[in-house]
Amino acid sequence: MNRLIKFSFNLILIFVLGLGLSGCVTTTRIPVQSSSPWEEIELANDDNPLDIAFVDDNHGFLVGANRLILETTDGGSTWEERDLDIPAEENFRLMSIDFKEDEGWIVGQPNLVLHSEDAGKNWTRLSLGSQLPGNPYLITTLDTSSAELATTAGAVYRTTDGGKNWEGRVAEASGGVRDLRRKEDGTYVSVSSLGNFFVTLDKTDQAWQSHQRASSKRVQTLGFKPDGQLWMLSRGAEIRLNDASGDYESWSKPIIPLVNGYNYMDMAWDPEGNIWAGGGNGTLLVSKDDGNSWEKDPIGYATPTNFIRIFFLKNPNGNPPKGFVLGERGHVLRWVGYS
C-alpha cells in the first residue's frame, strides 16, 4: 500500500513539474561541441578579472580586483602585470576600463578615476569629491577629454574637460545597482540591487524609467543584443529575449538550455551570430540557431571557474572582433575562432 502511494505521488510530482516547465525551452543534458573556438590564457595571478579594453589591434589592458592591471602587446595572447602610481596601502577593485585611440579611463572602487592620454603609459588620478552618489561602476570614453561615468547608485555624469569637472546627465539616481550596461548610442539598462525590477535610460532622457521583471524570478543581468534590443538572464538559469524594439515589457518565453543548479551571468553574440551564455561551474554554452538548441563548449566545461563576463570587442581598424571570457580566480579564455 505504501509503495502504491509513493508511486502515485511521484506521478503527480512529474505531472506538476511538466506543467511548470511547459512553454519553456528546457533540457537537462546537451551535447558537447567537437571543438572549441576558445583557448585558455595563463595569467600571472588569480585575482578576479572584471573588464578589458584595447587601444589598437595588439595593445590592450585587463583590470580587476585587488588593483589588478595587466597589459598585452600581442592582441591578448600574453599579459604582463603593470603597476599603478597609487600608495601600496590603498586597495581598489578596478571595475571598468575604456579607450578611444590613445585616450583611456579606468574607474574603481572605492571612488577612483584614472585618466591616460598616452595609450596607458601614464595614468593620472582624478578627484571626484565626496558628494558622488555611490561608487564608480562603468566608464565610457566619448571623445578627446570627454567621458561618461555611471555609478552603483545609478547616477550618470559626463566630463568634457578631461575629468576636471563632471556634469550630471540624470536628474535623479536610480538607486542601488546590481548590474549596468551602456549601448553605443548612450542608452543604459540597469538591474536593481535585489533584481526585482530594472530601469532604462534612453539616449535623450534625463530620467530613468522603471520596468517590472518578466517573471517572478529575480533578474541577474540585462544587456543589449547586436540589433539593440535587450536580453535578460534570471535566477533559475532562465534566458529571455526582448520581443519588440523599444517595448521593454515584451519578452519571449523563458529559454532554459541546461538545468545544472547554476545561474547564467552573461551573454554575448560572436562574429558569426552565435549566442554564448556563461555562468557558474564552467558553464559556457553556445547556440547556433537563435536559442533553439545549445551545446557545451569543451574548453569552458574543463575550466574550474565561474564565468562572469563575455566580451566581443570591435576593432577600430576593421579587423574581426576580439573575444574574451572572464572567469573568477584569474581564468580567462581568448577567442581564436573555429578551425
From Swiss-Prot:
Membrane topology of this protein: Lipid-anchor
Pfam families from the UniProt entry: PSII_BNR (PF14870)
Domain of life: Bacteria
Signal peptide: 1-23
One biological process term in Gene Ontology: photosynthesis
Keywords, alphabetical: Lipoprotein, Membrane, Palmitate, Photosynthesis, Photosystem II, Signal, Thylakoid
InterPro entries from the UniProt entry: PSII_CF48-like_dom, WD40/YVTN_repeat-like_dom_sf, Ycf48/Hcf136
Covalently lipidated residues, kind N-palmitoyl cysteine: C24
SUPFAM superfamilies named in the record: Oligoxyloglucan reducing end-specific cellobiohydrolase
Localization: Cellular thylakoid membrane
GO-annotated cellular components: photosystem II; plasma membrane-derived thylakoid membrane; thylakoid lumen
S-diacylglycerol cysteine-type lipidated residues: C24
Protein family according to the UniProt entry: Belongs to the Ycf48 family.
HAMAP family according to UniProt: Ycf48
Domain remark text: A 7-bladed beta-propeller torus, about 55 by 55 Angstroms, with a depth of about 25 Angstroms and a central pore.
Protein role: A factor required for optimal assembly of photosystem II (PSII), acting in the early stages of PSII assembly. Also plays a role in replacement of photodamaged D1 (psbA). Assists YidC in synthesis of chlorophyll-binding proteins.
Subunit structure: Part of early PSII assembly complexes which includes D1 (psbA) and PsbI; not found in mature PSII. Binds to the lumenal side of PSII complexes. Interacts with YidC.
Name of the protein this chain belongs to: Photosystem II assembly lipoprotein Ycf48
Species this chain originates from: Prochlorococcus marinus (strain SARG / CCMP1375 / SS120)
Chain's gene name: ycf48
